[in-house]
Regions:
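Ubiquitin-like/PB1-type beta-grasp interaction modules and other compact soluble beta-rich domains
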Residues: 1-61
Length: 62
């Protein structure tokens, strides 16, 4: 699958859901928004070999 994280493009081999992908990447779910094939996605969505996943960091604070 194609992965974009922090603006960097990668090709990654992964079978499973978004939650397991984030664990594999050591990314905290609370700090990101994930798009799967251009649409916002839940952590239970299943990722396939031909999918495009974009991990966008959320900026928060006061």
């Amino acid at each position: 699958m194609k992965l974009i994280i922090d603006g960097r493009k990668k090709t990654v081999s992964h079978r499973g859901d978004i939650a397991s992908l984030l664990r594999k990447l050591k990314v905290r779910r609370e700090e990101v928004v994930v798009k799967l094939n251009g649409r916002l996605s839940s952590e239970t969505a299943i990722v396939g070999a031909r999918d495009k996943v974009e991990v966008l960091r959320v900026i928060f604070g006061g």
